[in-house]
Amino acid sequence: MKFVISRNELGNLIKKVQNVVPQSTPIPVLTHVLIESCNDELVFTATDLTVSTRCVVKAKVYESGSVTIPSRRFFQLIRELTEANIEVAANSGEMATITSGSSCFRLLSMGKEDFPMLPDMQNALRFTLDSEQLKDMFQRTSFAVSREESRYVLTGVLLSISNGTMTVVGTDGKRLAKIDTNISLDPSFSGDYIIPIKAVEEIIRMASEDVQSTIFLDQTKIAVECGNTLLVTKLLSGEFPDFSPVISTQSSVQLNLHREELISLLKQVALFTNESSHSVKFSFSPGELTLTANCTKVGEGKVSMAVNYTGETLEIAFNPFFFLDILKHSRDELVQLGISDSYNPGIITDSTRSLFVIMPMRLHDD
């Protein structure tokens, strides 16, 4: 195998697959990237056996072939080189030669036969979606997934299809983010797919490369193809909790809140929360919202803003950082907050097809 490619393009190519490569694994070849060259094309593949990615680019191929190279060391080397073009050559599965100007390096390598094959998704059900829209849907929901491995199913993002609508949901049980869109699939088709957060984060990175993304659906896998990059991931097994009772909660009070002002006030008052509980009291009185937090070790913070509230005094407590996350992922300056009492969740919406839920906290004084 022998090819020549520009340093910048090679660096970008490795960067696209680098995040999939596991930092530590009992299977040495998984720390490698598979490089295949043929017909003036290079194919780079990386996998951790759950998430796999493949990138294809044009290059000057002098000899077809394949080799696997330690990914991180290769990436680090390419970043340090200064010449415009780089030559990579390999005659066996034991050593790859990297030449840049007068510099020459040899990296221990392995053969293609040791590298896991990328799952075949060509016969899977597929549909297309605007890449920026796909990226936006995952960005606005993935922040809410659980980071606790003990809550296995909640560490992924749900992609649900029903009646020609694709719904994406992330939740950790304390907050929930949901967004949906119409897709070009038979309305009779339905299915639920729980995508690992690592795969979701990679899809977000790659989804701005092309106008359209193609999504492939299989019972145990899902794939996304965007531009010259294909990502295939196994799905998380298990049943995603039924969230319909929470999002269908009828709120007796509907309020319009100015997002930027509320973000600023929440950041201020959050400095006075207890590190173990992080609770801010929202007190609604006619025409005003007052935010209060106090901590015996810090002190007390109290701020207020004008709101379109006309009822009796209503108090509810929320985690300010969860509330801030939701506000930061809203697209409008004016958001709607629906509440009923101190015990039921708050429902936050804007003019888009998104909905956020935040569970209340116990009202108390520290």
UniProtKB/Swiss-Prot annotation:
User: Where does this polypeptide localize?
Assistant: Cytoplasm
Principal localization? cytoplasm
- SUPFAM superfamilies, per this entry? DNA clamp
Domain of life from the UniProt record: Bacteria
Xref: SMART domains: POL3Bc
- Give the record's GO biological process terms: DNA strand elongation involved in DNA replication
Short name of one Pfam family:
DNA_pol3_beta
InterPro entries, alphabetically? Answer: DNA_clamp_sf (IPR046938), DNA_polIII_beta (IPR001001), DNA_polIII_beta_C (IPR022635), DNA_polIII_beta_cen (IPR022637), DNA_polIII_beta_N (IPR022634)
- Cellular component GO terms, alphabetically? cytoplasm; DNA polymerase III complex
In alphabetical order, the GO MF annotations are: 3'-5' exonuclease activity; DNA binding; DNA-directed DNA polymerase activity
Keywords in alphabetical order:
Cytoplasm, DNA replication, DNA-binding, DNA-directed DNA polymerase, Nucleotidyltransferase, Transferase
**What NCBIfam families does the annotation carry?**
dnan
Similarity comment text for this entry: Belongs to the beta sliding clamp family.
Q: What does this protein do?
A: Confers DNA tethering and processivity to DNA polymerases and other proteins. Acts as a clamp, forming a ring around DNA (a reaction catalyzed by the clamp-loading complex) which diffuses in an ATP-independent manner freely and bidirectionally along dsDNA. Initially characterized for its ability to contact the catalytic subunit of DNA polymerase III (Pol III), a complex, multichain enzyme responsible for most of the replicative synthesis in bacteria; Pol III exhibits 3'-5' exonuclease proofreading activity.
Subunit-structure text: Forms a ring-shaped head-to-tail homodimer around DNA which binds and tethers DNA polymerases and other proteins to the DNA. The DNA replisome complex has a single clamp-loading complex (3 tau and 1 each of delta, delta', psi and chi subunits) which binds 3 Pol III cores (1 core on the leading strand and 2 on the lagging strand) each with a beta sliding clamp dimer. Additional proteins in the replisome are other copies of gamma, psi and chi, Ssb, DNA helicase and RNA primase.
PANTHER family, per the entry: BETA SLIDING CLAMP, DNA POLYMERASE III SUBUNIT BETA
Designated name of the protein: Beta sliding clamp
